């Protein structure tokens, strides 16, 4: 009986400590990234969101509805303001198309165009094209522990494992308990800071902790950054196949 008890308990201990290393039980960076990806991951999701863009000449709001399937398919329709209403974007793998109702044209966004701002915000088309799974793009190392928003965080240094990537490295602050990224600095290959993200609010949606208010800042641009609000989110939603087609851009 004693041997049977050992056989049952030992695998449980291995499972509980699989992501830990060192005397102080510091988690491995790659294990933390995996947990972050698990928290955000979903086969399908539908979201409505509002961007508040704080530019040199004032602030403006842009509202959108976003359909996401897996890691490489998304469809975005802009709902407001009237000037942007009806603009749509489709991402399929490493390709991105945009439809403009004012010109009734669909164009493919590629090359240097990917670095351009989305709707004048601090986010680029390149940001939208990123693989949402960090572990697919970076290796991670825990470099410290800090508090952010009164939450204890692991501080991670992420280094790119791919050549064709917008940000060679990142520094991220991950909530120890909820496995949510609360703060992030993004760097060029030479170490120059390019963009920052600060999460202002986290909410539990469908048993997942999700940032619902964040401030993005392109440090190379003037202005006070872009606030991003998640107004609603449905995980594992039913999404018709036609949504992820070029024909849907003109509907």
Predicted regions and their residues:
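Bacterial N-terminal signal peptides that target proteins for export
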Residues: 1-10
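Bacterial N-terminal signal peptides
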Residues: 9-19
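Bacterial Sec-dependent signal peptides at the C-terminal "C-region" and cleavage site
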Residues: 18-26
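N-terminal mature ectodomain segment of secretory-pathway/periplasmic proteins
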Residues: 27-102
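Short hydrophobic/aromatic-rich beta-strand segments that constitute the beta-sheet cores
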Residues: 47, 74-78, 96-100, 106-108, ...
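Acidic/charged, solvent-exposed loop-and-adjacent secondary-structure segments enriched in E/D, K/R, S/T
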Residues: 101-129
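Short, conserved active-site entrance elements at the starts or edges of catalytic domains
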Residues: 121-159
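Gly/Pro-enriched, hydrophobic low-complexity segments
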Residues: 129, 149-246
